Amino acid sequence: MQKVGVIGTGNFGLALANLLSINREVLIHARREEIAEKINTTREYKGQVISEKVVAISDFEEITRECKLIFPIVPSSNFKEMLVQLRPFLTPEHILIHGTKGLHIESDINVVEELQRHEVLTMSELILKETSVVRVGCIAGPNLAKELSDKQVGGTVVASRYNDVITEGKKALHSSIFRVYGSNEVMGVEIASVLKNYIAIAAGMLEGLGYGDNSKALLITRGMAEMIFFGKAF
């Protein structure tokens, strides 16, 4: 069975690599060779014990040669830079399923009112724009890295316009401790993944100000309605 790739050695990237290792051998890409060596030598990084089925590398060409299914798990601020380095080795045969919560702004303009729709891209749109890859998707859900690394029961949504992307994502990720669901509404999933963070922050602010569950429930329900409005406009 072919290896699966993960790009990014942050907490979520490491946790995802361990989850994938239940079903597959995994290559995880580290930005620096010394990080890859530490993972391979100590089998531990950032407080997480790394599966023996996970091998760390620092070569983009190798990960694209060995893996047709790749999960880029890097911050949105670094996502385009990563794609620029990766794209010489990508082909339309690859599948990229990202786990990045964020939007890419194509302009240097900082005033939100002046932004145009074509200047704001989801990570899937950015992949399509910057690479030759056609089959793209994202994963999103209650995916706290600490709980995943502790092997607590969890789940995620694999979203893509292409059913074979969803199928490949499910086959790679699904296990007795991790449920995987599919959706063809990739843009809706990406937008919700971004906007829910603001609602979560606001809920924490309400609690800090001494407000109770009624206020938080109102915030969450109206926040969800606003997410829907935003999604329709997007």
Where are these regions (language model features)?
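NAD(P)+-binding Rossmann beta1-loop-alpha1 motif at the extreme N-terminus of oxidoreductases
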Residues: M1-I50, V54-D59, Q85, F89, ...
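Structural beta-sheet core signal
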Residues: V6, I28, L96-H98, C138, ...
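Electropositive phosphate-/nucleotide-binding environments in soluble metabolic enzymes
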Residues: G10, L14, E33, I57, ...
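Short gly/ser/thr-rich secondary-structure transition/capping motifs
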Residues: I50-I57, C138-I139, G182-N184
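Short, conserved active-site loop motifs that form the nucleotide-linked donor/cofactor pocket
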Residues: K53-V55, H94, F178
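Rossmann-like NAD(P)(H) cofactor-binding subdomain of soluble oxidoreductases
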Residues: I57, E62-R65, L69-Q152, G169
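Internal alpha-helical scaffold of NAD(P)-dependent oxidoreductase catalytic cores
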Residues: N78, F89, L126-V136, V153-F234
